[in-house]
Amino acid sequence: MRNTIEEANQAALSNMYDADPVLVDVAPASEVMLQLGEGTLLHAGPPVQWPAMCSPMQGAVVGALRYQGWAGTEEEAAALASGGSVSLQSAHDFSAVGPMTGIFSPSMPVFVVENRTLGNQAYCTINEGLGKVMRFGANDDSVIERLRWIEKTLAPALREAVLRAGGVDLRPLMAQALAMGDEMHQRNVAATSLFFRAIAPHLVRGSSQQASLSEVTDFLVGNDQFFLNLAMAAAKSAMDAAASINGSTLITAMSRNGTNFGIRIGALGNRWFTAPSLMPEGLYFPGFTSDDANPDMGDSAILETLGLGAFAMAGSPAVVGFVGAGTYRDALNYTQEMGEITLGHHPHLSIPNLDYQGVPSGIDLRKVVETGISPAINTGIAHKEAGAGQVGAGIARAPLECFHQALEALVNEMESR
């Protein structure tokens, strides 16, 4: 059995390491995610239905129903969602990932990222920027207006530029950003700048969106976290390439919906193993405390699943203070500790100040259970009430219960063959 597992893990690692994510389009979700039809919304994390959703996610669902035009008021939207008239599905089941509440609706534009090695695609919404945003559960008229601007103005300009460029290779940008101090979860300053540098010439050359070009460029340069969603889609395309390999103990997804935390492993495909989401530990913005916080949420842990975020914190000194990690020595300790539960180091994503060693990559279910070391995740902290927004940033841990469940299921699966 061990040989089978080792061979399976090597195959999964090869698929993950060889993934070549390229931004090939920016399109309405329903145009590229054909199963996302009328009456369906996607959300972050493992499956969860309306009654069990946390307040920020319920707020985002209400906002998406208004944005989509399926409800005219918050009351109508809440009645639709609570009455079962809307199908609420996990974004992961559609090869998609979304930050925080992670809500997708059919009209929302998405980044289309293709793994050119195997041909699979992954999707993520466009980052809304700062302030009052749907990913934290806000749903008033200003939020809807911004989403419609993204749909009608920003997305068409980006689509035209991406198609004119023939696609944007993301892996080289991510490698360079990592060398410049981003861990690509809570810090994307370099990655966003590099992306803008790559796309700007194509935005300004013959764009049909010339009248709104200044708005588009102002939005891009004013949002240091813009690249987050691109990094998430890139990571999803790599992890999906490593999924559904018989015998593999590689963790292919970690995700949270604000109520439950879920993981998937290579050998068991799309099956979720869940436990209650834990509270992040970190720093709170002035006026807020842990009493205001919602349990951990979002699909952005796909970055740690690949080896970025908290796993790469040794290469991102600037993020240490923001997430309350302590000193640089503490950040180094996080990266080294994560190396104890991974199968290798990513050959294309390296940390310069660790002699260009690759980030620890490929979380091994067996090592997590054997060591008792839980994967660490850099994360934003959402207010527990919809619409109040982000109240801090910190580090969350994956609940070990998920991994014990998965190992037991894997043993039962292999013994039954």
What spans do the regions from the language model cover?
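Anaerobic metallocofactor- and corrinoid-dependent redox/one-carbon enzyme cores
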Residues: 1-417
